[in-house]
């Protein structure tokens, strides 16, 4: 199992379980709730008392940090089963709803997801916005933190773009099963 060659900064967190106990077949995108750098995020995950981490983080400038190697489980989604099967990615965002992500961070997220999928044999990203499909990567292999804890993570901005993210990644993966992008709209 390898790590992403796109990483610009590494600061391994003690907050992890080693090794992960499941094959990587899922991705979980989180919002940081701050327009921070990869170094700042590394410092957030450094103290053992924090009891939180992610595999990767993307700074406001589009740089990519690694905090937990892919062979290990991060402590990111408030759910051990999800974190054992998922690569978790924290993305710098605004500090309040909709927790918007800037263009540099978004572009780096797409690049990182394409790389993760290629290296881990994930042929396409699947998003149905359906919590009941957790753990069924043949139907949906993107999960969100809000499904496991009382949080708004990944925020409205990223949540409403999950179908678009999957479509952009799948196009670059050469997926033959690309569906039109259906954006999520909040109920009135």
Give the location of each predicted region.
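Long, well-ordered alpha-helical scaffolding segments within enzyme catalytic domains
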Residues: 50-52, 85-133
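Structured segments of extracytoplasmic/periplasmic soluble domains
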Residues: 35, 44, 112-123, 168, ...
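Low-complexity, Gly/Ser/Thr/Pro-rich intrinsically disordered linker/tail segments
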Residues: 170-180
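N-terminal catalytic cores of peptidoglycan-degrading enzymes
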Residues: 1-83, 153
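Acidic carboxylate-rich catalytic motifs and surrounding loops in phosphoryl-/glycosyl-chemistry enzymes
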Residues: 125-148
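Active-site-adjacent mobile loop/cap segments within catalytic or ligand-binding domains
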Residues: 72, 76-106, 140-166
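Conserved small/polar residues in nucleotide/adenosyl-binding loops
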Residues: 184-188
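Residue-level detector of intrinsically disordered/flexible regions characterized by low predicted structural confidence
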Residues: 17-18, 179-181
């Amino acid at each position: 199992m390898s790590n992403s060659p796109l990483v610009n900064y590494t600061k391994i967190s003690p907050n992890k379980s080693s090794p992960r106990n499941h094959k990587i077949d899922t991705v979980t995108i989180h919002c940081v709730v701050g327009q921070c750098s990869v170094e700042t995020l590394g410092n957030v995950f450094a103290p053992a008392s924090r009891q939180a981490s992610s595999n990767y983080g993307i700074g406001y400038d589009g740089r990519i940090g690694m905090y937990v190697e892919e062979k290990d489980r991060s402590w990111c989604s408030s759910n051990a089963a999800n974190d054992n099967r998922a690569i978790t990615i924290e993305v710098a965002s605004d500090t309040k709803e909709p927790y918007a992500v800037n263009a540099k961070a978004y572009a780096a997220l797409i690049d990182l997801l394409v790389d993760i999928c290629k290296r881990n044999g994930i042929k396409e990203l699947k998003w149905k916005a359906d919590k009941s499909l957790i753990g069924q990567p043949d139907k949906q292999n993107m999960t969100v933190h809000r499904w496991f804890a009382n949080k708004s993570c990944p925020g409205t901005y990223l949540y409403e773009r999950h179908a678009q993210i999957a479509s952009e990644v799948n196009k670059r993966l050469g997926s033959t099963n690309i569906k039109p992008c259906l954006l999520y709209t909040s109920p009135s």
